[in-house]
Swiss-Prot record:
<dbReference type="GO" id="GO:0019843">
    <property type="term" value="F:rRNA binding"/>
</dbReference>
<keyword id="KW-0963">Cytoplasm</keyword>
<keyword id="KW-0808">Transferase</keyword>
<dbReference type="InterPro" id="IPR040072">
    <property type="entry name" value="Methyltransferase_A"/>
</dbReference>
<feature type="active site" description="Proton acceptor">
    <location>
        <position position="92"/>
    </location>
</feature>
<dbReference type="GO" id="GO:0002935">
    <property type="term" value="F:tRNA (adenine(37)-C2)-methyltransferase activity"/>
</dbReference>
<dbReference type="GO" id="GO:0070475">
    <property type="term" value="P:rRNA base methylation"/>
</dbReference>
<dbReference type="InterPro" id="IPR013785">
    <property type="entry name" value="Aldolase_TIM"/>
</dbReference>
<feature type="domain" description="Radical SAM core">
    <location>
        <begin position="98"/>
        <end position="354"/>
    </location>
</feature>
<feature type="binding site">
    <location>
        <begin position="179"/>
        <end position="180"/>
    </location>
    <ligand>
        <name>S-adenosyl-L-methionine</name>
    </ligand>
</feature>
<dbReference type="GO" id="GO:0000049">
    <property type="term" value="F:tRNA binding"/>
</dbReference>
<feature type="binding site">
    <location>
        <position position="112"/>
    </location>
    <ligand>
        <name>[4Fe-4S] cluster</name>
    </ligand>
</feature>
<keyword id="KW-1015">Disulfide bond</keyword>
<dbReference type="InterPro" id="IPR027492">
    <property type="entry name" value="RNA_MTrfase_RlmN"/>
</dbReference>
<dbReference type="GO" id="GO:0005737">
    <property type="term" value="C:cytoplasm"/>
</dbReference>
<keyword id="KW-0949">S-adenosyl-L-methionine</keyword>
<keyword id="KW-0819">tRNA processing</keyword>
Length: 393
């Protein structure tokens, strides 16, 4: 019998599972805390659970972390982990400490079916959805391995001296890694519940962000089920260009997407939508296109004035993309047009340049290596550099 991975369960599902084992709900709360707040992967560590329950769980369940293929640390504090998810697939997770926050960027799929022109992951194609356990295992590993480092005197977390963010190893989670989260909704929703649960990671809805390329029906669904902060990969000011850069636009054009964003604000934890905009030299970075964006989200746009902010993202070049990063002066000029038009606009700082380039590139290299190995030797993925699994904090 295959052991049940308890990382797959939100608290309600874990309570139902405990009831199947003849246990009361409060046991699920204890177990949940041991897993997510204390990082325990061994039932024997759970000292406030009855020995009979620990023995029962050891027979039928497990807490199975992902195998770490490699860990890359940047001089700016950024950490990128590459996790093995089986069948020649790997996913990336990135930890980004800043002065006022410490953000974990996690993946929701192995590969991606959307196929955005500027995205390394999209060029790899889609392999499969991650399970809830595989999504949460990224957060679980990062939280508890870094917590152990802090206990050993290593400086991790937000660099701020005071405030709630400085007390947390991870203060923010963004689903902006590999994959389209809203095309894996069945696994993403329970993972979000665990992130927000006070018995889990206790993050506020404002500090958890789902980024989507524009799956309109699922934006509506998320608004009804669990509205967290929403970011939308926009990247173009009109349908003609967005059809090319973000092929999903052919199914859900801008007017529909902006309508869903407007409706989302009624229940969102923030009073604005974040639009992500990858700056591509000579493609979408002219002043004229910036002015078109102002019209798109302004009073005369398809849904009227849409409260939003823009995050301009420097393009990370990767082989065969055929695209170039906009120059710094062009990015600043583009941003100034938006700012002068009354939009809050930021330019994302590039982080971890000395450890990797585009999101998905490490995973793509693993895919390529694995395909060669399968043809030549039929051997499993080669471990680049193993990292120890975290102990309970």
């Amino acid at each position: 019998m295959t052991a049940v991975n308890l990382l797959d369960f939100d608290l309600d599902a874990l309570a139902a599972y405990c009831e199947q084992l003849g246990e009361k709900r409060f046991r699920a709360v204890q177990l949940f805390r041991w897993i997510h707040q204390r990082g325990a992967a061994d039932f024997g560590q759970m000292s406030d659970l009855a020995k009979s329950l620990r023995s029962k769980l050891a027979d039928v369940a497990c807490i199975a972390p992902l195998r770490v293929l490699s860990e890359h640390r940047s001089s700016d504090g950024t950490i990128k982990w590459l996790f093995d998810v089986g069948d020649g697939n790997a996913v990336e997770t990135v930890y980004i400490p800043e002065d006022d926050r410490a953000t974990l960027c996690i993946s929701s799929q192995a590969g991606c079916a959307v196929g955005c022109r500027f995205c390394s992951t999209g060029h790899q194609g889609f392999s499969r959805n991650l399970s809830t356990a595989e999504i949460l295992a990224q957060l679980w590993y990062a939280e508890h391995s870094l917590r152990r480092e802090r206990a050993e005197g290593v400086s991790v977390g937000a660099r701020a001296a005071t405030g709630p963010a400085s007390e947390r190893i991870i203060s923010n989670v963004v689903m902006m890694g590999m994959g389209e989260p809203l095309q894996n909704y069945a696994a993403v929703l329970p993972a979000l519940r665990v992130m927000l649960d006070d018995h889990g990671y206790g993050l506020s809805r404002r500090r958890v962000t789902v980024s989507t390329s524009g799956v309109v029906p699922m934006i509506d669904r998320l608004a009804a089920d669990l509205p967290v902060a929403l970011a939308v990969s926009l990247h173009a000011c009109d349908d003609a260009l967005r059809d090319v850069l973000v092929p999903l636009n052919r199914k859900y054009p801008l007017a529909e997407l902006l309508g869903a964003c407007q409706a989302y604000l009624a229940s969102a934890p923030r009073d604005f939508i974040t639009f992500e905009y990858c700056m591509l030299d000579g493609v979408n970075d002219s002043d004229e296109q910036a002015r078109a964006l102002l019209k798109l989200v302004g009073d005369k746009g398809p849904v009227g004035r849409l409260p939003c902010k823009f995050n301009l993202i420097p393009f990370n070049p990767f082989p065969e993309s055929g695209l170039k990063r906009s120059g710094n002066e062009r990015v600043q000029a583009f941003a100034q047009v938006l700012i002068d038009g009354g939009l809050v606009t930021t330019v994302r700082k590039t982080r971890g340049d000395d450890i990797d380039a585009a999101c998905g590139q490490l995973a793509g290299e693993v895919q390529d290596r694995t395909r060669v190995q399968e043809r030549m030797t039929r051997s499993p993925i080669r471990v680049i550099r193993s990292a120890a699994q975290p102990d309970a904090a």
